[in-house]
Structure formats: structure tokens, C-alpha cells
């Protein structure tokens, strides 16, 4: 057998495996503070209250998500942070919204990140704002070194049972239901039969795309587009989970190991309403008990014990993050 033929076969095998997702790795960043710097890193894609940018570099697909609906709304901030493994925090002003972003990052225990600031930001004041929070642990860089340091960051993956969190869903003519989301655990393969939660609907993965390329499987933490059979777009919502049967909990009441935010000064009372963020889910709830803290939801929530639930009061004129805690 000729050497040329062997080399051809090797190139074909590597290409096939790269395209099928075996060698394609992924990194997801959230860009906070001065969000428009994300445009320098990747090409703009989906735009809603979350804006996504992406770029493929050799065998790594990098995605940057910005909470473009924030600060008008608090909800996209939590959702954008929950979509990322790493944080890029480029501070351009020291106001209550910067404080809110620091509290959100600390609440969600996002301790892997890079911190920079514009020249007009008082560094000592910024340092006092982040003192005692996860942001204090971030790598501090000058803004001109941001990209250089970001390029050193390595992908994080796991081999847990497959799980995907949905962030967008729509109908495509000739294709059907298309779901955009992030593989948070394990790998998802073409023709997998999985469940959509909290509805409990059976879905089959018809096809998978990563960065507009068809692939046979996608490995955590890949961002993917899935064509699915079994669910209509109006049955799918942001925050829904696609996973194997019996690997997640679906309940209408949860108990938290709760810590109230020291910045939220108003008392909480039984039967008071709130919004709760778990992953990408934002659901209306009431305090059914204060000690221990229990929440009752209008619609069931998907979770695993240990997931962080963040309680929000969007109408608050000061801090909109009331408190948080892992779900028991």
C-alpha cells in the first residue's frame, strides 16, 4: 500500500473525527461590564436578551455570551453567567449594576475568570468592591492583554450522563424543531433517544450542528444546534433540560440551604412572591416556609440536589438579588 494512500486515509480519518465532534473542543465565556468588547473576540450570532459571539480556532470552538438585556432586566445576567465556564469581566464604571454583577458571580460561585478595567476606573475602589468575593481570585490584566490571556484558557469537560440546557428554540421550514443550547454534561449523539424536562417528553436527536458544521456527536461543554423529533417549539422553553430518563429531578416545591444577601434590606415573609433562577430557568414562586426556606412554584422546576437557586426581586430599586442557596 502506498504511503500517499496511507496519508490520505489518515487525513480523512482525522477530518471525519474532527467534524463528528470527537476532536472538537469548546470553551464558553460570559462577557460582563463593558459587553461590546465581545465583538472583538468572535462573530455575532443569535441576538435576544442574550447575545452570542463565536469563533473556531483550530480544534476549539469559543463562544462569548453577553447579557444584552441587562441592566434593564436582572434575569439575563444570571442566565448568561450560567451558560459559561469562564468569566471575562471588563469594568468600565463603578455603579450599582457593577455591584450587582459582582454579587451574581459570587452567588453562582464563578471563580474562574479574567478581570480588567478601563483607564478611568479607580482601581482601589474596584478592589474594595470585589474584596471577599470570587472576583478577587480572577486574573487581573490590562485591557490590551485580555485576548492574550484568554487564549491560554483550556477547555473543561466531563464524562457524566448526557445533559443539555436549552437557551433558544424555533421552527425551521423543512427541518422542524431546532433547539439551541449547551451540552453541560457528557456527550450527545445523533439518534440518541432522550427526555425533555420538565415536560417529560420523549425526543430523538435527528441531527447536530456545531459552528454550522454537521457533527455526529457533541462533547460537553459544546454549544450545539439540535434538530429534534418529538417536541414542538411551543413545548420547549429556555432553561428546559434534555437528558436521560431519571437523571434529573422535577418538582413544584424545593428546600434551600438559604443565605440572604446582606445588601437586600427588606424582610421576607411567608406567601410572598419572587422569581427564582436555577440554571437558565426563571420561574415564579412563593415562600411556602421561611425556616427552613421552601419555595413553591407555579410550574415545576428541573434540578439536581446541590444546584444553586438564586431568588430575585426584579422590581427592587436597589439590589435585585435577594439571596440564594444550594437546593437540598
Model regions and ranges:
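Hydrophobic alpha-helical signal peptides and transmembrane signal-/tail-anchor segments
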Residues: 2-13
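Short coil/turn connectors at secondary-structure junctions
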Residues: 24-26, 110-111, 161
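Short catalytic-site patches enriched in acidic/histidine residues
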Residues: 164-186, 208-209
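C-terminal effector/interaction modules appended to NTPase cores
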Residues: 11-86, 91-92, 183-190, 194-328
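Conserved C-terminal guanine-recognition region of P-loop GTPase G domains, centered on the G4
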Residues: 77-83, 87-134
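Helical mechanochemical/support elements of P-loop NTPase systems and associated helical scaffolds
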Residues: 73, 97-101, 122, 142, ...
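Signal for well-folded cores of large energy- and translation-related assemblies
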Residues: 106, 151-154, 171, 184, ...
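Canonical P-loop GTPase G-domain recognition
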Residues: 119-171
Amino acid at each position: 500500500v502506498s504511503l500517499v494512500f496511507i496519508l490520505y486515509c489518515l487525513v480523512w480519518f482525522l477530518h471525519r473525527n474532527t467534524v463528528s465532534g470527537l476532536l472538537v473542543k469548546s470553551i464558553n465565556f460570559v462577557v460582563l461590564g463593558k459587553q461590546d468588547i465581545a465583538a472583538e473576540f468572535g462573530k455575532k450570532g443569535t441576538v435576544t436578551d442574550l447575545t452570542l459571539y463565536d469563533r473556531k480556532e483550530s480544534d476549539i470552538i469559543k463562544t462569548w455570551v453577553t447579557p444584552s438585556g441587562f441592566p434593564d432586566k436582572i434575569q439575563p445576567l444570571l442566565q448568561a453567567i450560567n451558560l459559561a465556564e469562564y468569566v471575562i469581566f471588563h469594568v468600565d464604571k463603578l455603579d450599582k449594576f457593577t455591584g450587582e454583577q459582582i454579587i451574581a458571580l459570587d452567588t453562582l460561585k464563578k471563580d474562574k475568570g479574567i478581570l480588567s478595567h478601563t483607564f478611568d476606573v479607580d482601581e482601589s475602589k474596584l478592589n474594595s468592591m470585589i474584596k471577599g468575593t470570587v472576583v478577587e481570585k480572577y486574573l487581573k490584566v490590562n485591557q490590551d492583554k485580555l485576548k492574550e490571556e484568554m487564549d491560554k484558557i483550556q477547555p473543561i469537560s466531563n464524562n457524566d450522563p448526557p445533559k443539555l440546557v436549552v437557551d433558544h428554540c424555533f421552527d425551521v421550514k423543512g427541518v422542524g424543531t431546532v433547539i439551541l443550547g449547551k451540552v453541560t454534561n457528557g456527550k450527545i449523539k445523533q439518534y440518541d433517544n432522550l427526555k425533555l424536562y420538565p415536560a417529560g417528553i420523549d425526543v430523538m436527536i435527528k441531527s447536530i450542528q456545531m459552528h454550522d458544521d454537521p457533527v455526529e456527536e457533541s462533547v460537553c461543554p459544546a454549544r450545539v444546534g439540535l434538530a429534534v423529533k418529538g417536541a414542538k417549539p411551543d413545548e420547549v422553553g429556555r432553561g428546559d433540560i434534555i437528558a436521560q430518563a431519571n437523571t434529573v429531578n422535577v418538582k413544584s416545591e424545593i428546600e434551600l440551604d438559604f443565605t440572604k444577601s446582606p445588601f437586600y434590606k427588606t424582610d421576607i415573609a411567608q406567601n410572598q412572591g419572587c422569581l427564582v433562577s436555577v440554571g437558565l430557568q426563571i420561574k415564579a414562586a412563593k415562600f411556602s416556609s421561611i425556616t427552613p426556606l421552601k419555595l413553591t412554584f407555579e410550574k415545576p422546576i428541573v434540578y439536581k440536589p446541590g444546584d444553586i437557586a438564586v431568588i430575585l426581586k426584579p422590581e427592587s430599586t436597589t439590589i435585585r438579588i435577594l439571596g440564594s442557596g444550594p437546593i437540598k
